[in-house]
Amino acid sequence: MRREGTMRLHRTFLLRVYLKESAVITYPASKKIYCQGKIFPTIRVGMREIQLTNGDSLTLYDTSGPYSDPNISIKSPQGLPRLREPWIKVRPRKTQLAFAKEGVITPEMEYAAIRENQKRELKKNTDQERERRLQGNSLSARIPNPITPEFIRNEIACGRAILPANINHPESEPMIIGRHFLVKVNANIGNSSLTSSVEEEVEKLIWALRWGADTVMDLSTGKKIKEIRETILRHSPVPIGTVPLYEALEKVDGDVKALTWEIFRDTLISQAEQGVDYFTIHAGVLNRFIPLTQKRVTGIVSRGGSLMAKWCLLHREENFLYTHFTEICEIMRAYDVSFSLGDGLRPGSIADANDEAQFAELKIQGELNRIAWKYGVQVMNEGPGHIPLNLIEENMTKQLAYCREAPFYTLGPLTTDIAPGYDHIGSAIGAAFIAWQGCALLCYVTPKEHLGLPNKQDVKEGLIAYKIAAHAADLAKGHPAARQRDYLLSQARFEFRWHDQFNLALDAETARLFHDETLPKEAAKHAHFCSLCGPKFCAYKTSHEVRDTLQKVT
């Protein structure tokens, strides 16, 4: 399936999904490589290596899993190889948090550490002045170089990071979420009652993996919820999250009043048995907080939050997710499912940002964190929402304080309400800012936000916007693995190595397409100009001439 030579190196992304055939992801000028573990020598961590025309190469964090390995054939319904199964079989049935607290480094922890480092070491001849000038400001975060398995173990033990890895999802490749690591991006997929099929959702999953989704949430609310989730899990090398409330509500035909703790509990167990890695649980929406939303412009915009608020009012009882929280912890501990404590009262408009209802729920999230940790369950906290730039820092500061530095997972935040059709841009601005402040996981927003169910193109555009935001934050934080790609691309740009510029880009296909709109011939890929400035006004070309003149003078 791989073609050699120049044409192979310059090919754009190919994705084919047939439920009875192979699914393949390829990247231009790239090959799949594996890094071996040291503590656990049988570990092989997949990465992507980009080959450059000047002989250099770049190793990248890779979310594509076996789909980009030409030596692995993936067919449905069997799904992916069960990578973690041998590790799980030979050890006690404990959570990653329990192992971490006991001082035990698991294979998953070493795997995640190797991924974070991306085979990257600082060169001995690094420009020290440049390093001092560009070193990041991590805002009290501690990012070691290199990141070790012991560091990951300690971060998990302290509750500052999670490694979501259900024992029944052995296909997943271990990854770490926390503010002392690379900023991660989540993609939402899933059908609705009006559209989408099992095949379409698997295709969206693999498409999301190709564009860098670190985690994926299946938010299906229509028919075949269980079948879609099972197929997604068996075909996903990244952690899968869900909102169990959606399926529980489907079981009672959408009748909120008919929903019970018992129905929800059975749904929770069923999804944990399937292998879901993290659950969004809206346990912080309490009776006494609901009246606080009355003055809001947009009320309660979280689906789960609004459903639980309605349930509380119909039954005149406290939220059963809160009253049964310890039982939920026991279920999740049995499978090593992580909490993603839902922000059911997040603001859905700039007018409602940072209000009393939002922060009241955040405080409860902090209390629930401590209960989850007591039960040995990993936990992260979901956050807003719609927040203007000047109020974002307060969100991060309060989350760190209330939730004792547990990972923060935010939807954006959107920094303005006026961008329907472009909310992926308005929210990526907020995402970059809050990720620099310490947010660990960014939930992408697509151009269809507020408008409809995303299609494949929307998924791509949302992920590209958020990978830019995450990378910008990693640069600002000074993550040791962040800057090399920027350096190599800038070098290629200055040296007019057009193919390398394209291949180092987040979206090589679009970069090449834009260039070729006006200069499509192969000769233009070696020209010392582009169509923006032409041969006479290219600043890079002139800069080379200036350098040559200076060298002659000196």
Curated annotation (Swiss-Prot):
CC cofactor note: Binds 1 [4Fe-4S] cluster per subunit. The cluster is coordinated with 3 cysteines and an exchangeable S-adenosyl-L-methionine.
List GO terms (cellular component aspect): cytosol
Q: InterPro entries from the entry?
A: ThiC, ThiC-associated_dom, ThiC/Bza_core_dom, ThiC/BzaA/B
Please verify whether the record's keywords include Metal-binding.
yes
State whether it acts alone or in a complex, and with which partners, per the record.
Homodimer.
Similarity section: Belongs to the ThiC family.
Q: What is this protein called?
A: Phosphomethylpyrimidine synthase
| Organism the protein comes from | Coxiella burnetii (strain RSA 493 / Nine Mile phase I)
What gene name is listed for this protein?
Answer: thiC
